[in-house]
Amino acid sequence: MEQPINVLNDFHPLNEAGKILIKHPSLAERKDEDGIHWIKSQWDGKWYPEKFSDYLRLHKIVKIPNNSDKPELFQTYKDKNNKRSRYMGLPNLKRANIKTQWTREMVEEWKKCRDDIVYFAETYCAITHIDYGVIKVQLRDYQRDMLKIMSSKRMTVCNLSRQLGKTTVVAIFLAHFVCFNKDKAVGILAHKGSMSAEVLDRTKQAIELLPDFLQPGIVEWNKGSIELDNGSSIGAYASSPDAVRGNSFAMIYIDECAFIPNFHDSWLAIQPVISSGRRSKIIITTTPNGLNHFYDIWTAAVEGKSGFEPYTAIWNSVKERLYNDEDIFDDGWQWSIQTINGSSLAQFRQEHTAAFEGTSGTLISGMKLAVMDFIEVTPDDHGFHQFKKPEPDRKYIATLDCSEGRGQDYHALHIIDVTDDVWEQVGVLHSNTISHLILPDIVMRYLVEYNECPVYIELNSTGVSVAKSLYMDLEYEGVICDSYTDLGMKQTKRTKAVGCSTLKDLIEKDKLIIHHRATIQEFRTFSEKGVSWAAEEGYHDDLVMSLVIFGWLSTQSKFIDYADKDDMRLASEVFSKELQDMSDDYAPVIFVDSVHSAEYVPVSHGMSMV
């Protein structure tokens, strides 16, 4: 009999704001069949035994026999006793150019494995178990789906939660690819060389445990690379652009893509390698890591814009997690609660539900970053993106952060429309190729175009000369000065802290609308660093810092003059709703003065300030 839900004891942290993301196990459908009590999972609609012991009995481990003396049983035969046929004396590895006495059954089985990767995996792929020795791989449902997609599609991107066993399924696919294809080079890329080497080790194990009739001969069997006698090879590399340049790969596998720094540079090197062949493959797998480059790759794949086939799997794909500590099926209720309590809800969503949360400590909240949309426009020859053309009756303010090193950091100029209550980014100059000698002339061109708008310049090493040239040489009177000697603003800890805090409020409260794609991308990797804010390793923050200058300026009294406002208090503009709520909560006390005495009449929920 089903038990009623106790709202005090049966709360789950995933169920927030009235949304039921996980049902209590007492609400699941049940049935009795074949002497087993079955419970229907809410995740895949399949029936599972109530007891974990029954689940293990139905999915029992299958050991692979050690067959080295019965070649007629070719499905498991390895000629281990013949050292002349072994590579470097290793019993599980066949030496190159060893002749195989093929039978019709062997040929048919070989073709079946070539054409059906799932059959190949479930029939011949094995792992070494710490207790049972060599056992057959038991594929999970998601692993079967992944194998089918990777095999049939040219470009695949997989958004997966942690600890699903993705390395195992990728290793099986790589082993299948090099065993059944001639002259194919495979490159494994990861954040670190040790991570790509781990994937290669798992692939080597999959090849090593194949029976002799499926295993190609070994030419090289090194720590960082292998080569087979069919001409195929696999190499493990760190994800630097130099790793793939000069090589021609038939397939590239990128592991933990979301955690690779400077991925843009690596991606520019990878694309020509893949595009060199019409059938070249690329496979990307990762757990999300905030809203960085992988978020863009995944979004483009889901929207069908990039040619990548998207696939995702989350924590409930591991069926052992659907049983509690008492080995009773609860559909993952206890496991998910314990995991969340051991970390945080946001971390659980990112690492176990493959959700794109903001990178830990980003200036702008992850929820806001996820809904920020950009407008795609083609920049002009100088790198200026125009989102809205200038209008004569509107008021604009510009901020400029000059690059300190040509070819490295970027010049970043933002032009903001401050006419209405909601401010809007209407133009962006973003370039790291413009010389600071000619930058004042280029900047002035756009400032004049936007109604000769005022500009606030950060006085860094090159900003001083740019501001001086703009104000004195070009006689542009719209340069906003902090003093008689400072033709702009000098960035300090205080100005940066106030500017960052103000910018966060402006964007999260929809006071400032951003249209520039690169600006939004920089926000995704602009996070807390000690007691300040900065771009994460391998990323830029020039566009964000130019907006931080605008955030600081908007808090200054002179902003009213440049924005052509009669009177403005930024807190009233940004937090109007919060201030109104405070006003309602703390209504004033009303004093009534009569002829004989004075008395007060408190308004309900009022508060006396006396």
Curated annotation (Swiss-Prot):
Enzyme Commission identifier(s): 3.6.4.-, 3.1.21.-
Motif (Walker B motif): 251-256
Gene: 17
Protein's UniProt keywords contain Oxidoreductase: no
Region of interest (Binding to the portal protein), ranges: 328-352
Effect of residue 255 to N/T/V: Complete loss of terminase small subunit-stimulated ATPase activity
GO cellular component: viral terminase, large subunit
Sequence motif ATPase coupling, location on chain: 285-287
Mutagenesis or variant effect for residue 256 to D: Complete loss of terminase small subunit-stimulated ATPase activity and in vitro DNA packaging activity. No effect on ATP binding and endonuclease functions
Keywords: ATP-binding, Endonuclease, Hydrolase, Magnesium, Metal-binding, Nuclease, Nucleotide-binding, Viral genome packaging, Viral release from host cell
Annotated InterPro entries: P-loop_NTPase, Terminase_6C, Terminase_large_su_gp17-like
Marked site positions, Modulates nuclease activity: 409
Residues that bind Mg(2+) 2: 401, 458
Residues bound to Mg(2+) 1: 401, 542
Binding site for ATP: 138, 143, 202
Domain of life: Viruses
A biological-process GO annotation: chromosome organization
Active site per database record: 256
Chain ranges for the short sequence motif Walker A motif as given in the UniProt record: 161-167
Residue ranges, annotated region (ATPase activity): 131-301
GO molecular function: ATP binding; ATP hydrolysis activity; DNA nuclease activity; endonuclease activity; metal ion binding; nuclease activity
Impact reported for residue 256 to V: Complete loss of terminase small subunit-stimulated ATPase activity and in vitro DNA packaging activity. No effect on ATP binding and endonuclease functions
UniProt-recorded name of the protein: Terminase, large subunit
Family named by the database record: Belongs to the Tequatrovirus large terminase family.
